[in-house]
Amino acid sequence: MDSTGRAYDGASEFKSVLVTEGTSHYTPVEVYNILDELKTIKITSTIAEQSVVSRTPIPLSKIGLSDVKKLFDINVIKCGSSLRIVDEPQVTFIVSYAKDIYDKFMCIEHDSAYEPSLTMHRVRVIYSMLNDYCAKMISEVPYESSFVGELPVKSVTLNKLGDRNMDALAEHLLFEQDVVNAQRENRIFYQRKSAPAVPVTFGDDLEPAVRERANLYHRYSVPYHQIELALHALANDLLSIQYCHPTVVYNYLSSRAPNFLRLDDQVSLKLTSAGIGTLMPRPVVQLLDYDLVYMSPLALNNLASRLLRKISLHLVMQMVTAVQQDLGEVVSVSSNVTNPASACLVRMNVQGVQTLAVFIAQSMLNPNISYGMLSGLTLDCFSNFIYGACLMLFQALIPPSALTARQRLDINNRFAYFLIKCHATQATTASVVPNQVIYPVDAIDQWQSNRRDVLVAIYNNLLPGELVLSNLIQTYFRGNTAQQAAEILIPADQTSYGANETRALSAPYLFGAPINMLAPDARLSTYKRDLALPDRSPILITTVEGQNSISIEILRHKTGLIRAMYLNGFVTQPPAWIRNANSNTALLSRFLDVTPNLLGIYEAILANTYANAVNVYCDSVYRADIPTEWKLHQSVDPQDLLFGVFGIVPQYQILNEAVPDFFAGGEDILILQLIRAVYDTLSNKLGRNPADIFHLDEVFKVIEEIVSVLVQQKVDARKYFTESMRSGSFSKPRWDNFLRRPVAQRLPNLDSVIMTQADHVYNYMTQLTHIIPITDCFYIVKNSGFVDRGSTGPVMASSSVYENVLKVVHTIADFEAANALRLQRRSVDNTSYTDSLSDMFNGLRSISSSEFVRSVNGRSVFTEGRIDAIKVNMRVKFDLQFITEEGGYSKPPNVKKLMFSDFLSFLDSHKSDYRPPLLTVPITIGLNNLGETNSNTLRMRSEAIDEYFSSYVGAQILVPINVVDTRVYTEFSELRNFFTGDVVITDDPFDVWDGVKATYIPIGVHGVRLDPNGDQPPL
């Protein structure tokens, strides 16, 4: 139809258009009144849609240097003494682990002390850290012009860095000259300098004008430890694998356009004219394990839905009234006369033809997503010549996979029943019935419940003179012998439905090819192979010799069979419709004459599949092991072909919009591969199968969180492993089957690199465990505490003690051993009980609190020299608190302590736990900042001061002071050396284009020919 609404090539004036919306599975049906026969077929595909897959699983963001989270805290004190005045107190910088930084990875706040649980937790957290740290690229460092002597320099502006303002820290130094010198050295240390090299290696072959160069970057020395900058530095790697210059995108899109498409001119100009520093999401070459989609009902259902949305068929048809009028003249009856011929006149279903065409198209695109349920398939269905003829033609239009094996078997048996009833000689019937080859014609129940192929059995037991029956069956089986028809193509144990796929169940369909040897549409195979794309194509719907030619042989074979069935006479009593029914035979003759009209369906399908041939959801391989309940089912009525035969106008110009998805449709496949990859990662880290250690719910929770990060959407992994598309319950056998399957294809490079990156972060973080507040053991004592009021050292008091003053008298191996001691109870008297752990504790030697506080020189000294202790080998976390002691002593500090009774309560609360949580042990350290005061009060050995420091004494569960990882610097240069790291950033931030839509436009017209040698021979 042209833009004015008239048909082409002299056809009559356009009369009406019937548009049926229905559901998304249906497309508009165009209805015309066509008088002239058209000779030319031209099919074009109009494609204009975003057709490239580019993903940024870890999208990058920009932050300033001051936004970098700090791993270390700095405390500044001036150490004095409680026994004497110190004229020049030592300025000391204490560097300690900062709370809330990387704590999720280190399990500071929560998690089990059980080592595998800790490992799995850390693997999970790593991926959130990729977003929290590695995806945040430092893009701004404040700097200013200054001088070092007479030399002009660009120094980092320290006063914009908060508590990392090294100039402010230098002001704590005792002497003014030291302050000035330190600040001058800061300007020398923290400078902007030329970058030694390009930090971001994109690895693309770019033109020199748009290639990254070192002179576009600068290196900044900043007051951060390299550990604090390390994760942010990984952003460069994430940038290079997820982004590229627009010219790379242009080359990618141009090389991947099939020969009927080219990139839109405006898009091409925009991409090729992009300057240096411009980036786009990098196109992803996804060489995925496409067969995985057939292991998950959800993935298969999603793929089927996408496929159905891509079917766009425009069938050109005559007006229903015109067809009815024409046929009424043929059969010489009016529409109110009741017989099969007149009945068919009122049964012209336009929408039914469209439904059948869409069903045929989806069966060609992928034989594994759906199946048809034939309506009207009764035992005596072939006695209705309209139904029988339409069913035979329907077989010629569909691959065998379009129907279930059970339905195909039923068709064979219904055909066998018709042959025995109408065409078999009396001698044949007398031969095969007694030998139980078939059932008697009147044994209706046995025929209907039969589960064997009776047609093959008849074929194999025909009498030598039974030519009519032999020819009919041989024609039906496409010339195959009885032995060939009985050949098993797929054994029953390799099918989900437990039935043998024989050649007899494939031969009557399409080209007669076996169900496991359906020919793929190879028109675009060279294009796909050149790009290393998967060689997945729809089922070929044309002849193998002419890949864009539809052969009339498809239908000629079936029309010959229909003539033999209904018009060449009957050996036995004919069906009722034959008697005195000239109108019926006239209708059938006309029906067979115009059967080539059905090629119009193939024209529309071929136009659609040409574009779809590059899509990943296409497949020509039938997979018998896919459960039937996973597939979509659709009710189809073969009699709907009736209007298709009489009403479709073939050889008509079809303007068809068919948009290829290219890689789209592989999302679920990628998710399934990521699920497997994450599961394997957990297995490697744990050293065994995670399901052997944890409940599957725990494992899936970790898998889902990681995969959700990588695909940037919420993923419910369990939904991929159910019994069917309509079942929401998880199937353990499906999951086990998924794990047993060998990994056939590695992850796309993008995801593989990101997972490798995550592994690097994991290994890097585990190397930092020495600074985190977790230790492998703790001690139980009767009393503890430490006071050193007379020292000029940084630690003045503590709620714990040093490990060298502990005398281990008992060792408890682990939580289970401690729990067992607690459960070993015995009666003390008639009213009380004790347990072995309490007995062990009560046996420890007790030290008076006064020994921890009062001494001649202000330092704790014990009469016995050491403290009896029980060592418990359990992972615990410690909560470190600093109190700055400046000599006021006005109010005793609130020092947290853990008592033995608290430990007993912990055991009682978790006695049934296989994996207990971490016990938290508080440690409080009083820092010596007495150099800030000149008060004489602090040197008085009063009981009030002793009482003040007794607040530090009394803890019974402790982690030794020396376990706490702190760094003490008395020289400012040492502090500066510790906090010196390098950042290399671009002078001009990257310009990222996220909203560019890559569109294709068609090139030329691609024709589909009916029999390339010219005119069609009559049927």
Curated annotation (Swiss-Prot):
Capsid protein which self-assembles to form the inner icosahedral capsid with a T=2 symmetry, and consisting of 60 P3 dimers. One of its GO terms (cellular component) is viral outer capsid. This is Outer capsid protein P3. Keywords: Capsid protein, Host cytoplasm, Outer capsid protein, Virion. InterPro entries: Inner_layer_core_VP3_Reovir (IPR016029), Innr_layr_core_VP3_Phytoreovir (IPR015312). Disulfide bonds: none annotated. It is found in: Virion; Host cytoplasm. Homodimer. Homomultimer. GO terms for molecular function: structural molecule activity. Its main location: virion. It comes from Rice dwarf virus (isolate Fujian). The lineage of its organism: Viruses, Riboviria, Orthornavirae, Duplornaviricota, Resentoviricetes. The keyword Endoplasmic reticulum does not apply. Belongs to the phytoreovirus inner capsid protein P3 family. The keyword Metal-binding does not apply.
